[in-house]
């Protein structure tokens, strides 16, 4: 496919002037000859509003055009051009880059399976290149975007067997693998994976510096989400002795989750810090709600005991008011932190809404609605957890937009800014 042009010194070219078309020029021995490789050129007949015209282009022009479309966030056009390049120029120096960037373009159009096919071909045909490693990461991320969490977890387990991973690669792979396990509700396995990532980071922290703290933040945050999930699942049940045991379990899990969220804030990633601050406030508000919705003694049931029931709830609210006060202070501190850092994201908005709600609940003039007495003897209803941030599909370090159900992107009420443009191979 490559055309070769042989160039000799100008004096020889001049000597050839005037020769007939059938004359042969002989290059004397010892005269330097330069070989220039030129890209193959395509000529196509293109129909337009003004009729058919000829269009010429080479592989470099097509590659640059596709790259410009991808950078301009026109993924459909970029995918079309990369596909055209791979079809019309199947074996050039641009093939590997066109496969990778074409995969990124199909990620942009959310055609995950097609993106996976591009990355898989690159990984198979260029297994020894560093781009094959990046392609594997993209494959795992695409499976997560599809909600195929088992295959995503398996893909990142395979990546962790590679010998060419740096510290950032390992923590990202462990974080994404643990995230997939978390989405599968395999909390014990996810917890072990996240803990392995923390152990690894602590072992190299004095020798290596991470390029991004995003995935370390993801790991710590989800080490808080796991006890938070367990906290939500613990019911408050009668009789009184059982309720005391349940309360101790919930309090223990609350403190465990809070401890991990605080560790996440210490990492310093603004997005994960915002998510963690919000979740700490949510812990105390959820604990308060658990008490309010807990079953009540049988002697307080029935219309005849309505007055007694109202007194019971009034006293209960006085005793657990401190939980709302803690939640209010936490959201206030979170908002102050985010203002100081200049963070504007969905977590900030959620904390503002929660802060306003808690102010109303703590207002002495607020009129409470009494809990449904028919819940007596039943388990405490578990409020649905807010979405948490997800890892971005592109390799990088910014949480993705809030989406439900969570995809393979970064924390989740989850909510966070969209990731920046993916890295192209240039």
Go through the PLM ranges and name each one.
Residues 1-14:
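Sec-dependent bacterial lipoprotein signal peptides
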Residues 16-426:
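Acidic, polar-rich low-complexity tracts and alpha-helical solenoid repeat scaffolds
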């Amino acid at each position: 496919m490559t055309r070769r042009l042989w160039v000799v010194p100008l004096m020889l070219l001049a000597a050839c002037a005037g020769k007939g078309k059938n004359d042969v020029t002989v290059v004397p021995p010892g005269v330097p000859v330069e070989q220039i490789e030129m890209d193959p050129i395509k000529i196509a007949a293109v129909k337009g509003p003004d009729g058919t015209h000829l269009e010429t282009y080479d592989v470099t022009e097509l590659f640059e055009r596709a790259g410009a479309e991808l950078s301009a966030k026109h993924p459909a056009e970029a995918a079309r051009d990369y596909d055209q390049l791979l079809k019309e120029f199947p074996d050039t120096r641009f093939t590997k880059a066109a496969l990778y960037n074409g995969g990124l373009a199909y990620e942009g159009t959310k055609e995950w399976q097609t993106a996976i096919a591009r990355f898989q071909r690159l990984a198979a045909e260029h297994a020894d290149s560093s781009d094959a490693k990046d392609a594997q990461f993209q494959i795992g991320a695409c499976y997560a975007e599809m909600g195929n969490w088992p295959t995503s977890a398996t893909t990142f387990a395979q990546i962790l067997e590679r010998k060419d991973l740096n510290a950032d690669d390992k923590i990202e792979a462990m974080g994404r693998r643990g995230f997939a396990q978390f989405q599968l509700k395999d909390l014990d396995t996810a917890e072990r994976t996240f803990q392995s990532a923390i152990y690894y980071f602590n072992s190299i922290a004095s020798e290596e510096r991470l390029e991004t703290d995003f995935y370390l933040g993801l790991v710590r945050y989800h080490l808080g989400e796991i006890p938070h999930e367990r906290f939500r699942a613990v019911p408050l049940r009668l009789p009184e002795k059982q309720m005391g045991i349940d309360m101790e379990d919930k309090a223990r899990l609350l403190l465990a989750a809070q401890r991990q969220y605080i560790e996440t804030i210490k990492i310093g990633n603004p997005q994960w810090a915002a998510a963690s601050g919000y979740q700490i406030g949510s812990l105390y508000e959820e604990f308060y709600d658990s008490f309010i919705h807990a079953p009540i003694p049988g002697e307080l049931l029935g219309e005849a005991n309505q007055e007694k029931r109202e007194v019971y709830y009034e006293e209960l609210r006085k005793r657990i008011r401190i939980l709302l006060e803690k939640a209010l202070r936490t959201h206030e501190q979170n908002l102050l932190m985010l203002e100081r850092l200049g963070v504007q994201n969905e977590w900030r908005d959620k904390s503002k809404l929660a802060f306003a709600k808690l102010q109303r609940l703590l207002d002495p003039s607020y009129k409470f609605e009494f809990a449904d007495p028919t819940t007596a003897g039943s388990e405490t209803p578990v409020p649905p957890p807010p979405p948490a941030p997800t890892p971005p599909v592109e390799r990088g370090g910014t949480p993705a937009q809030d989406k439900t159900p969570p995809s393979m992107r970064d924390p989740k009420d989850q909510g966070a800014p969209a990731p920046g443009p993916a890295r192209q191979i240039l």
